[in-house]
Design a protein with these regions (language model features):
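Short, surface-exposed tryptophan/glycine-enriched loops
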Residues: 126-147
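Acidic/polar, compositionally biased interaction segments
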Residues: 115-121, 134
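Short, conserved secondary-structure segments in the cores of folded domains
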Residues: 21, 72-74, 138
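A short, structured loop/turn motif at beta-sheet edges
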Residues: 79-81, 107-114, 140-147
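Terminal (often C-terminal
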Residues: 17, 27-99, 105, 109, ...
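Beta-strand-rich receptor-binding modules of extracellular spikes/adhesins
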Residues: 1-34, 156
């Protein structure tokens, strides 16, 4: 039956509160926290011919995992106040428009936006890039019910750049 102290219970290599397992330790000393928020999502299909001069939320319809069920409709909602590791990678493909003034990928939270910006014509001697991958990782301070999503912005240029299914957004509670 384990040992209980003020509702906290130690039983079968697990630390529990009520019937919720907070921490499990295996015979080698490895630990897992099954209720620790964590997610990884990707687009279900490519997002084609993005229109320049406007923010575009990235559609992430395929969840690889979602511990805690805090990711829905391409948005992560922090279940508790804490510091979260958030990661994104956007794969641009199919005739990336090097005539655009700039590309901006953004990890947007309720408290702050984190951006990566580049001029796609930084090397005039190359032809039109077919693929371009950019990543961004941050430790973000989030309060309970704050949200995070990823966005894309193309300044100028033509409607020709696509976002591929190799794009992803992931995160987990650190502290």
């Amino acid at each position: 039956n384990g040992v209980s102290i003020d509702g906290l219970k130690v039983k079968d290599y697990s630390l529990m509160y009520g019937s919720n397992i907070a921490l499990t330790i295996d015979s080698s000393g490895r630990t897992t926290q099954p209720n620790q928020p964590a997610f990884l999502a990707q687009p279900t299909s490519a997002q084609l011919n993005l229109v320049p001069n406007g923010y575009r939320d990235i559609d992430l319809g395929t969840e690889r995992f979602d511990r805690g069920s805090n990711f829905a409709s391409s948005v992560f909602t922090a279940p508790i106040t804490g510091v979260y590791q958030l990661n994104m990678s956007i794969g641009l493909q199919n005739n990336v428009d090097k005539n655009a003034d700039f590309y901006q990928i953004e990890l947007s939270t309720s408290n702050r936006d984190y951006a990566w910006i580049i001029d796609p014509n930084f090397e005039a001697s190359i032809g039109t890039p077919v693929y371009w991958h950019s990543t961004l990782s941050v430790l973000a301070d989030m309060d309970a019910n704050d949200t995070a999503k990823i966005r894309f912005y193309q300044g100028g240029g033509s409607t020709q750049t696509d976002i591929g299914t190799n794009t992803y957004f992931s995160g987990f509670l650190v502290a």
